[in-house]
Structure formats: structure tokens, C-alpha cells
């Protein structure tokens, strides 16, 4: 049975770095889905498709998103193509939303495999400051939100710590996947 790996975690936890590393793994049946976001594309940030709010709304009305939500004054969407990828036997990983986990669970049921990337408060503060996108007040708000969301995670959400070396996190990620050997065995 294929799985939709729903990677969540606070801004600054390292989801984008982990997703870039996952793309390099020799697992051809593990597909990383991009997101549609109403913010400009970034050179070093997430590989996403930038849309205006109007473009996003049109796609939303057309049912082009399998999942969509709003956070931090932006709209986020995951394309409906992930459903096709799952039907074709691929495993799919998406950069999800902690606040939208319940809705994702309702849509995907047992296919959903939630993984929460965690970091210590000090590491998160340092990363948010280093990227320079948020004010000190916004950083404080994000830190509080990270703590609040962490306390509300359901017990089936697997925790993956990313305080240290990315390669160690990647290795732990691979060990969490109950299907990575089967996924690798289907190389074409």
C-alpha cells in the first residue's frame, strides 16, 4: 500500500533542506510534491510555484488542489496530481501544515503517514534569525506557535529531530519508512 508522507514542522525546522536531500535519494518511487504558494519564489528557499492570490483562487475553484490552506498571510496548495501518483503506486511526500493535519487525515485516512520535524527552541530561534525573513516579534510568535502545535500533535505523528547534522536526520528519516526497501526495489 502506498503512503502520503505528510512532513510537518515549524518554519525554520529544516523541512526544505530535508526535502532537497530526499530528492537526491535513490528511491525512484518516492516523489516529492511541490507546493503552490502566494509568495514569490526564493533562491534558497522552497522549490514552489509562485501564484498571485487571484491565480490561487482560480485553481482552488477549479478543484486543482488536493490539499490547500492559509497560514502566515499566504495561501498554500498541493496539486491534485498527488492522487494520481498514489494510484499509480508511488509514495509521495508533501510539505504539509500542522494546523491542516486533521483535514489531510480526513481525506487520506490510513494512506497518510505524518512525520513531524522537530528542533529545540534555541535552534529554531537561531535559524529564524539567520534567514532574516521575520522580525523579532514574528520570531517570538513563531516560537510560541511551534510550542503550541507540538503539544497538540496526535500520537501517530512520528517525531523526527533535526537539531544536528542533516545527514543524520536523513538517515533517521529513511529508517522510519516502512517501505523504503520495496520502494528502492522498483527501480526502472
Curated annotation (Swiss-Prot):
Pfam families per UniProt: Guanylate_kin
Species in which this protein is naturally found: Pectobacterium atrosepticum (strain SCRI 1043 / ATCC BAA-672)
Classification via InterPro entries: GK/Ca_channel_bsu (IPR008145), Guanylate_kin-like_dom (IPR008144), P-loop_NTPase (IPR027417), PhnN (IPR012699)
Protein family according to the UniProt entry: Belongs to the ribose 1,5-bisphosphokinase family.
Function: Catalyzes the phosphorylation of ribose 1,5-bisphosphate to 5-phospho-D-ribosyl alpha-1-diphosphate (PRPP).
GO CC terms, sorted: cytosol
EC number(s) reported in the record: 2.7.4.23
GO biological process, one term: 5-phosphoribose 1-diphosphate biosynthetic process
Pathway the protein contributes to: Metabolic intermediate biosynthesis; 5-phospho-alpha-D-ribose 1-diphosphate biosynthesis; 5-phospho-alpha-D-ribose 1-diphosphate from D-ribose 5-phosphate (route II): step 3/3
Binding-site positions, ATP: 9-16
Keywords: ATP-binding, Nucleotide-binding, Transferase
GO MF terms held by the record: ATP binding; ribose 1,5-bisphosphate phosphokinase activity
Gene: phnN
Top EC category: transferase
Record flagged with keyword Nucleotide-binding: yes
Name this polypeptide is given: Ribose 1,5-bisphosphate phosphokinase PhnN
Swiss-Prot/TrEMBL catalytic activity: alpha-D-ribose 1,5-bisphosphate + ATP = 5-phospho-alpha-D-ribose 1-diphosphate + ADP
Amino acid at each position: 500500500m502506498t503512503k502520503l508522507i505528510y512532513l510537518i514542522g515549524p518554519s525554520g525546522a529544516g523541512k526544505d533542506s530535508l526535502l532537497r536531500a530526499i530528492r537526491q535519494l535513490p528511491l525512484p518511487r518516492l516523489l516529492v510534491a511541490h507546493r503552490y504558494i502566494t509568495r514569490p519564489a526564493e533562491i534558497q528557499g522552497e522549490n514552489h510555484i509562485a501564484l498571485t492570490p487571484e491565480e490561487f483562487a482560480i485553481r482552488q475553484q477549479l478543484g486543482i488542489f488536493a490539499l490547500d490552506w492559509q497560514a502566515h498571510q499566504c495561501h498554500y496548495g498541493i496539486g491534485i496530481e498527488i492522487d494520481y501518483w498514489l494510484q499509480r503506486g508511488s509514495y509521495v511526500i508533501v510539505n504539509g501544515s500542522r494546523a491542516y493535519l486533521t483535514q489531510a487525515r480526513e481525506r487520506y485516512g490510513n494512506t497518510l503517514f505524518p512525520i513531524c520535524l522537530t528542533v529545540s527552541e534555541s535552534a529554531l530561534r537561531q535559524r529564524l534569525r539567520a534567514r532574516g525573513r521575520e522580525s523579532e516579534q514574528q520570531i517570538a510568535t513563531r516560537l510560541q506557535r511551534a510550542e503550541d502545535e507540538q503539544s497538540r500533535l496526535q500520537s501517530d505523528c512520528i517525531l523526527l529531530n533535526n537539531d544536528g547534522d542533516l545527514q543524520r536526520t536523513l538517515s533517521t528519516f529513511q529508517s522510519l519508512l516502512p517501505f523504503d526497501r520495496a520502494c528502492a526495489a522498483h527501480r526502472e
